[in-house]
UniProtKB/Swiss-Prot annotation:
GO terms for cellular component: ascospore wall; extracellular region; fungal-type cell wall; fungal-type vacuole; prospore membrane. Residues 1-21 form the signal peptide. This is Sporulation-specific glucan 1,3-beta-glucosidase. The keyword Cell wall biogenesis/degradation applies. The gene is SPR1. It comes from Saccharomyces cerevisiae (strain ATCC 204508 / S288c). Its EC number is 3.2.1.58.
């Protein structure tokens, strides 16, 4: 969220390749996909190709904590009903406050229960074909001063991959948090820090990343893990983009292609840069291939976005898809949501409030009242117009992102939210079932 791992059974290609039997040779023609044509094809071992784009969901708030997804984990720290003083703002401070052993106990319980095998079966039954699984660097390595619980998450990731395989789902592994934080978001593990390009932090991040690439790019996993996102949402307007490219992205690509000779797909988040920014980086013309650009799209994280009329939101969503079509790389909308407000508790962070009702404040910035957030999580009190608009917004985004490689909605489930919970939205008949069902067709034409 604004918030980013061959070839044996069923692999994803992004080109019109004929006779695309799974092969083990390591060259550009055996890549899971390239991007010369705007088609996506699943190629089965029986050689029957089925046109199918990515229709995925994010498993947010599981192996990387996010307070708004599982507020119960953070509410246990509350000392008074009037403010959020003393409540950890992220996983770093959650672990720091509890101490290692108690944090491990609570996190292990959360990891064991928040997603189970039946969730993967349900996700597949609802027509999705991929899950994107965020994980932090601290799952694989830590710095000497880190309070994080480490070396436990990998078991749950591996089990998730097994479940995905069992139910015919593909997996993207997403390095969601870098040492020192790449964006200052709470979902990076450490809020209000932007230090991942410092030498020690970069070294730890690269250590975790090369481990992920080494393990999940082997033939044992390549039938199911069809992409590895090198880093989720690096904050391009703040960090040094050249250092990001030269010290993390390019070395990771070279390590994958030249050191371990794998054709695993690499996913690069757009770093909040404009369309076409990445056209000249790791592209087919330079004989560098198998790279997806991941765009994340939300319309609730500024006062301007929150005041848009519905027709304007739809128009902007449709334009996202149209703008991505002409990029050099294939792209996927790796995050987006149904949200029309920022009212979900702690969406903007513990202690920060919501812009929609004017309660948001950070440093010297304030928001102004647009409308009430009361009853935001009580669907019985949603006006019919809001339900219709939410469905309309979802459908427009799905149609827009079908113009390129597909989409991965954020996120599959939460404890309390409606706008950010695909599972609840399906139950409420707000998210379409089947996925191609449209109450509001042709919005992007």
């Amino acid at each position: 969220m604004v918030s980013f791992r061959g070839l044996t059974t069923l692999t994803l290609l992004f080109t019109k390749l004929v006779n695309c039997n799974p092969v083990s040779t390591k060259n550009r023609d055996s890549i899971q996909f390239i991007y010369k044509e705007k088609d996506s094809i699943y190629s089965a071992i029986n050689n029957q190709a089925i046109n199918e784009k990515i229709h995925g969901v994010n498993l947010g708030g599981w192996l990387v904590l996010e307070p708004y997804i599982t507020p119960s984990l953070f509410e246990t720290f509350r000392t008074n009903p009037y403010n959020d003083d003393g409540i950890p703002v992220d996983e770093y401070h959650f672990c720091e406050k509890l101490g290692y052993e108690k944090a491990k106990e609570r996190l292990y319980s959360h990891w064991s229960t928040f997603y189970k095998e039946e969730d993967f079966a349900k996700i597949a039954s609802q027509g999705f074909n991929l899950v994107r699984i965020p994980i932090g660097y601290w799952a694989f390595t830590t710095l000497s001063h880190d309070p994080y619980v480490t070396a436990e998450q990998e078991y749950f990731l591996d089990r998730a991959i097994d479940w995905a395989r069992k139910y015919g789902l593909k997996v993207w592994i997403d390095l969601h948090g870098a040492a020192g934080s790449q964006n200052g978001f709470d979902n990076s593990g450490l809020r209000d820090s932007y230090k991942f390009l410092e030498d020690e932090n970069l070294s730890a991040t690269m250590k975790a990343l090369t481990y992920i690439l080494s393990k999940y790019s082997t033939d044992v996993y390549l039938d199911t893990v069809i992409g590895i996102e090198l880093l989720n949402e690096p904050l391009g307007p703040v960090i040094d983009m050249e250092r990001l490219k030269n010290l993390l992205l390019k070395p990771a690509y070279d390590y994958l292609r030249n050191k371990i000779n794998s054709n695993q797909i690499i996913v690069i988040h757009d770093a909040f840069q404009p369309y076409h920014y990445w056209d000249g980086f790791l592209n087919d013309e330079k004989n560098e291939y198998g790279v997806i650009i991941d765009h994340h799209h939300y319309q609730v994280f500024s006062q301007v976005e929150l005041t848009r009329k519905m027709n304007e939101r739809i128009k902007i969503a449709c334009q996202w898809g149209k703008d991505a079509v002409s990029e050099k790389h294939w792209s996927v909308a790796g995050e987006f949501s149904a949200a029309l407000t920022d009212c979900t508790k702690w969406l903007n962070g513990v202690g920060l409030g919501a812009r929609y009702d004017g309660s948001w404040t950070k440093d010297n910035e304030k928001s102004h009242y647009i409308n009430t957030c009361a009853n935001n999580e009580n669907i019985a009190l949603w006006p019919e117009e809001r339900k219709q608009n939410t469905r309309k917004f979802i459908e427009a985004q799905l149609d827009a992102f079908e113009m390129t490689g597909g989409w991965i909605m954020w996120c599959y489930k939460t404890e309390n939210s409606i706008e950010w919970d695909v599972e609840k939205l399906i139950q409420l008949n707000i998210f379409p079932q089947p996925i191609n069902d449209r109450k509001y067709p042709n919005q992007c034409h």
